[in-house]
A protein has these predicted regions:
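Loop-to-helix entry region of an early transmembrane alpha helix in multi-pass inner-membrane enzymes
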Residues: 5-7, 12-32, 70
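Transmembrane-helix motifs of polytopic, lipid-linked glycan transferases
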Residues: 20, 24-44, 83-87
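Membrane-embedded alpha-helical segments of multi-pass membrane proteins
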Residues: 24-32, 59, 75-83, 124-125
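Specific aromatic-rich, kink-prone transmembrane helix
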Residues: 36, 56, 76-94, 105-110
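Short helix- or helix-capping micro-motifs
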Residues: 53-59, 110, 114, 128
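Short acidic/glycine- and proline-prone juxtamembrane loop motifs at membrane-interface regions
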Residues: 68-76
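Short hydrophobic alpha-helices at membrane interfaces in multi-pass membrane enzymes
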Residues: 90-111, 141-145, 149
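Transmembrane-lumen/periplasm boundary regions of multi-pass, lipid-linked membrane glycan transferases
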Residues: 112, 124-206
Length: 206
């Protein structure tokens, strides 16, 4: 996981240890993510749309405080997650300019997002769904599959560690979230959590 990389980077390998330095990596990652969201909105529509997107992103309690201030794996994940979406948007807007280097770059970005938290693989699921319904001819593009293989290379350390530790990561989360039958209380808790984490005003406006 890249969870430890940000504090190691921001503290100069623990040569500068303070409350600020420990959180600085997450703060910088959140700042860059906000800029990427602005660039994505600008690319898709206009600078004004980019500004509004960046404002909504910053107003989210999750992106600005939880992932943007606390020392969590979400901090590097959001950086590479938003960067991957920007790269995908570039392909949607200007597919003719998307060469093999761009495809490999996308594979690396999604790989880094996945190395932060395995949820990063959903980026390929979402992008694959878009291609299937809107750009099915791209599924014949060989560099698409090379990019997926690049991402899988980033997943190998996760698999290696879990193989050596009896897949404890997934066993822990399975015991925590998997229950038999419909859990109305858990469903309500999830929806309420999303509502509060994203900032009620942002949740409603979006």
């Amino acid at each position: 996981s890249l969870h430890d990389a940000l504090p190691i980077f921001s503290t100069f390998n623990l040569h500068w240890v303070s409350t600020l330095s420990m959180r600085l990596g997450s703060i910088l990652a959140a700042a860059v993510s906000t800029w990427i969201v602005f660039r994505t909105g600008t690319l898709i529509h206009s600078a004004r749309a980019g500004w509004v997107a960046a404002l909504l992103y910053t107003c989210s309690i999750y992106t600005s405080i939880i992932a943007g201030l606390f020392i969590m794996p979400d901090s590097p994940q959001l950086l590479f997650f938003t960067w991957s979406i920007y790269w995908m948007a570039k392909w949607v807007i200007k597919p003719q300019q998307f060469n093999w280097i761009n495809w490999i770059g996308l594979g690396c970005l999604i790989g880094l997002a996945t190395l932060s938290k395995v949820h990063g693989l959903y980026l390929w699921a979402g992008f694959g769904g878009f291609l299937l319904f809107h750009q099915i001819r791209t599924l014949k593009q060989p560099f698409l599959y090379i990019a997926i293989l690049v991402t899988l290379c980033f997943v190998l350390p996760i698999l290696y560690w879990n193989l050596g530790n009896d897949f404890i990561t997934y066993k822990f989360h399975s015991k925590r979230v998997l229950h038999s039958g419909i859990q109305l209380a858990s469903f309500t808790q999830q929806i309420l959590g999303e509502f509060l984490y994203q900032n009620p005003l942002v949740y409603i406006s979006c």
